[in-house]
């Protein structure tokens, strides 16, 4: 197949061997190569070709054009070289703050935004110092990066003062969130059940002859002696609530834990945790 074609010495094109002699004779006599585009042009039309094609091209190359990176006006003939140097400069991405060259900055921004909108599975999310979360115990808003240390202090065992002779337990206000309308530094509560003797003694009143009312006084030791031995032993045993960690006697611990867990669950539903 290569023998069927030959290269013309004038126009440098492949010509069929069957017509090669005729083509080369005609080409050497009437065809010349354009010095600008090196295209074979008839000699009689070379002047017109230079004026129409190459003169307009030269004039357009002198026109100013804006660089797509710095928007400066540069001659069109020098625009490619200018944009090559200008696009190699770097700027920080506004989303990830990484230095990116101007040539690929627009594509990087699109990828960066899509990556932020769809975080990868299994990727560890680092809590930022500005974000806050709510403590389940004290219900205070605390920074996420201090949540672990806060929980160690917030869930520490509470100090309980028990006065045996008057049957009073003084408990710090870790359950303040259970009663939003009544927040106090400490909660004092008589956890002893009321007995028939105690209720009847408080209801009976004896009027003296001078019109004054005399209320019978009963000491804490006397009230404690009225309780059954089994109940008294149960009230001497204190355990922590599994939710709020306060110490309570066994007879009221179960009821308290149910209420405490129910309120904590309602709080989580309310805040969308």
From Swiss-Prot:
Its main location: cytoplasm. Gene3D superfamilies: 6.10.250.1730, Zinc/RING finger domain, C3HC4 (zinc finger). A zinc finger (TRAF-type) spans 22-80. It is found in: Cytoplasm; Nucleus; Mitochondrion. GO terms for biological process: apoptotic process. The keyword Cytoplasm applies. The gene is Xaf1. One of its GO terms (cellular component) is mitochondrion. Interacts with BIRC1, BIRC2, BIRC3, BIRC4, BIRC7 and BIRC8. Part of an complex consisting of BIRC4, XAF1 and BIRC5; the complex formation requires IFN-beta stimulation. Interacts with RNF114, the interaction increases XAF1 stability and proapoptotic effects, and may regulate IFN signaling. This is XIAP-associated factor 1. InterPro entries: Innate_Immune_Apopt_Reg, TRAFD1-XIAF1_Znf, XAF1_C, XAF1_C_sf, Znf_RING/FYVE/PHD. Seems to function as a negative regulator of members of the IAP (inhibitor of apoptosis protein) family. Inhibits anti-caspase activity of BIRC4. Induces cleavage and inactivation of BIRC4 independent of caspase activation. Mediates TNF-alpha-induced apoptosis and is involved in apoptosis in trophoblast cells. May inhibit BIRC4 indirectly by activating the mitochondrial apoptosis pathway. After translocation to mitochondria, promotes translocation of BAX to mitochondria and cytochrome c release from mitochondria. Pfam families: TRAFD1-XIAF1_ZnF, XAF1_C, Znf_XAF1_N. It comes from Mus musculus. Keywords: Apoptosis, Cytoplasm, Metal-binding, Mitochondrion, Nucleus, Tumor suppressor, Zinc, Zinc-finger. The keyword Transmembrane does not apply. Residues 181-228 are annotated as: Disordered. It comes from the Eukaryota. One of its GO terms (molecular function) is zinc ion binding.
